[in-house]
Curated annotation (Swiss-Prot):
This is UvrABC system protein C. Keywords: Cytoplasm, DNA damage, DNA excision, DNA repair, Excision nuclease, SOS response. One of its GO terms (molecular function) is DNA binding. Disulfide bonds: none annotated. InterPro entries: GIY-YIG_endonuc, GIY-YIG_endonuc_sf, GIY-YIG_UvrC_Cho, Hlx-hairpin-Hlx_DNA-bd_motif, RuvA_2-like, UVR_dom, UVR_dom_sf, UvrABC_protein_C. Residues 204-239 form the UVR domain. One of its GO terms (biological process) is SOS response. Residues 13-92 form the GIY-YIG domain. GO terms for cellular component: cytoplasm; excinuclease repair complex. PROSITE patterns: GIY_YIG, UVR, UVRC. SUPFAM superfamilies: C-terminal UvrC-binding domain of UvrB (SSF46600), GIY-YIG endonuclease (SSF82771), RuvA domain 2-like (SSF47781). It comes from Acetivibrio thermocellus (strain ATCC 27405 / DSM 1237 / JCM 9322 / NBRC 103400 / NCIMB 10682 / NRRL B-4536 / VPI 7372) (Clostridium thermocellum). Interacts with UvrB in an incision complex.
Length: 625
């Protein structure tokens, strides 16, 4: 039994991070302290002086842990990492923070590539972002490919140089043709550095360089090449003209301001490079109904810059933040040179902050309006589904199932949950099919439903005995039964599931989601009839969203298992090839198939692979033939 009062006496007079947990051992809050003893004790003393949010959190605390650090800076870094990892419900959180995409330029490779990623690693690559949508990333990458002749094929270089013919892009001057050896590693990297400068808002530097190249081409009577360079210069100038000059200080700045409502907050960031606005992003924050402006801004700065790809020399804020000195020190360490945090009270910088704040308010109002519309459509969808299927009650909890496989391997099932018409991702579940190893959708679906309902029986029994969770409680999982059950498939799937429901004595309505010849949702079927959805666009979209989500979730798991089998299993069998070397091999060659076809000398070029190990890898694949 954890005795909080006794444990409070043991707290040290040192900096560190404290971790609050509830009765289920779930982390509900993470914080940092200059002196752990003083900070943690404050939560349990004079609660009347605390905010309602803090009082609510303390009521849930059943135990706490702490990690001592040598310095306050170390505590700050650890706090940021733990919040990002565990996303505790009483911390202020960026909405879906873990999913923000970045642009990655693989400057750690001989012939760098440009791609989208959701993970920032210390691997020598250059990262730009975060962006708030994958669409924005893809749009930017497409623009880069129009302006710069970067390679877009899947060839692994330098391994594939000279293998095969060049693609169409090479012939229309949209690629330099590194796969043909037409450009050296140094020349290609030089061009990719221009790409990085462009993504960083340094168009003027690129334009000056291109104007010099254009003059040189014209002097050498290479008029076609000069014309292509001229067109690229015009495109870059057009982009630069659209980037409004909003600061007379020709330096790199991030300007951050916010807008708040009773329940939500929106923070807007303007990215200013060389005095020009090169981009902006907005972020919705959860759990801000009862926090001060300073607390809100502090939490955002910590979370945003803990994963930001770039830290500018100056960060301009709307509001003072706590621990400004230590946060400045942390950001300067990430940047490599000094970063200054400023909160302007007058002048040009204050006007900048006010402009960003107005934009944050616009984004917040649009967000609230969108949420309102989505809730109304979800409610209408549930009501129409109840009416169409003649259900006894509104289907507030809908569970949908799908099966995905690669022939007779990677057979998996998905369970997605829609609660009050919206996805409840915390209740999603994945199933790896165990009872069969052949492609059989009916049996696979039966296994998934059987396992799900057996778990429900177990949890309901535990609840009756006093150990379970209530319906709707976080972590309730399988103990919460659906109002309606939807499966991807037709009458055969419905009948297969009904036999399981009867066997386990559950009375849950079940329907199959069927598609037309174009693989689009058409209707719902029972064993006896089909309900046509085409006449009601709201209901059709509602069911389509559920079916698509079930399919996406199943396919995602199938691909994950398939990738693991292809990229991991063979290399794992080779002595001396651990996780790091395996990662380097895949990064260099692109696939296990390419490693298998490589000669020992080529394998030995991979970082961390000796000549002896390269020979061992080569011999292993020869023995498997």
């Amino acid at each position: 039994m954890f005795d909080i009062q006794e444990e409070l006496k043991k707290l040290p007079d040192k900096p560190g991070v404290y971790i609050m947990k509830d009765e289920n051992g779930e982390i509900i809050y993470v914080g940092k302290a200059v002196v752990l003893k003083n900070r943690v004790r404050q939560y349990f003393q004079s609660l009347s002086n605390q905010t309602p949010k803090v009082r609510a959190m303390v009521a849930h605390i059943k135990e706490f842990e702490y990690i001592v650090t040598d310095t306050e800076l170390e505590a700050l870094i650890l706090e940021c990492n733990l919040i990002k990892k565990h996303r505790p419900k009483f911390n202020i959180l960026l909405k879906d923070d873990k999913n923000y995409p970045y642009i990655k330029v693989t400057m750690n490779e001989d012939f760098p590539r440009i791609l989208m990623t959701r993970r920032v690693e210390k691997d020598g690559a250059k990262y730009f972002g975060p962006y708030t949508s994958a669409y924005a990333v893809r749009e930017t990458i497409d623009l880069v490919k129009k302006l710069f002749p970067v390679k877009t094929c899947s060839k692994v270089l330098p391994r594939d140089i000279g293998k095969g013919r060049p693609c169409l892009n090479y012939h229309i001057y949209q690629c330099l043709g590194p796969c043909q050896g037409n450009v050296s590693k140094e020349e290609y990297r030089f061009m990719m550095q221009d790409v990085c400068n462009f993504l960083g808002g340094r168009q003027e530097d690129i334009i000056k360089k291109l104007e010099k190249d254009m003059k040189e081409a014209a002097d050498n009577l290479e008029f076609e090449r000069a014309a292509r360079i001229r067109d690229k210069i015009n495109s870059l100038k057009h982009i630069a003209e659209k980037q409004k000059i909003i600061s007379t200080a020709m330096e790199d700045q991030d300007v951050i301001a916010f807008a708040k409502s009773e329940t939500d907050s929106c923070i807007q960031v303007f990215f200013i490079r060389g005095g020009k606005l090169i981009g902006r992003e907005h972020f919705i924050l959860e759990g801000t109904s009862d926090v001060s402006d300073s607390e809100l801004m502090t939490a955002f700065v910590k979370q945003f810059y803990s994963s930001a790809a770039y830290v500018p020399g100056q960060i301009i804020l709307q509001e003072d933040i706590d621990e400004m000195e230590i946060i400045e020190k942390w950001l300067s360490g990430k940047r490599g040179t000094k970063t200054y945090i400023k909160v302007p009270r007058r002048g040009e910088k204050l006007k900048l902050v006010e402009m960003v704040s107005k934009n944050a308010l616009i984004e917040l109002n649009q967000f609230k309006e969108r949420i309102k519309k989505e809730a109304a459509l979800a409610k209408e969808g549930m009501e129409k589904l109840k009416e169409l299927l003649n259900l006894d009650r509104l289907p507030r909890r809908i569970e949908a199932y799908d099966i995905s496989n690669t022939g007779s391997t990677e057979i998996v099932g998905s369970m997605v949950v829609f609660e009050n018409g919206s996805p409840k991702k915390s209740d999603y579940r994945r199933f790896k099919i165990k009872s069969i190893n052949v492609q059989n959708d009916y049996q696979s679906m039966q296994e998934v439903i059987f396992r799900r309902l057996k778990r429900a029986q177990k949890e309901m029994t535990e609840k009756d005995e006093g150990g379970g969770k209530d319906v709707g409680e976080k972590g309730a999982g399988f103990g919460t039964l659906p109002d309606v059950l939807l499966v991807d498939g037709g009458t055969g799937h419905v009948n297969a599931v009904r036999s399981v429901l009867e066997e386990l004595d559950f009375n849950i309505p079940v329907y199959g989601m069927v598609k037309d010849d174009n693989h689009r949702t058409r209707g719902l079927v029972t064993g006896e009839r089909e309900f046509d959805l085409s006449k009601d666009i709201v209901l059709l979209r509602f069911v389509t969203a559920i079916q698509d989500e079930a399919h996406r979730f199943a396919l995602e798991y199938n691909r994950k298992l398939r990738a693991k089998r292809y990229s991991g299993s063979v290399l794992d069998n080779i002595e001396g090839v651990g996780p790091k070397r395996k990662k380097e091999l895949i990064r260099h060659f692109g696939s296990v198939k390419a490693i298998k076809e490589a000669e020992p000398g080529e394998i030995a070029k991979v970082k961390g692979i000796s000549r002896d190990l390269a020979q061992k890898i080569y011999d292993y694949f020869r023995q498997q033939e």
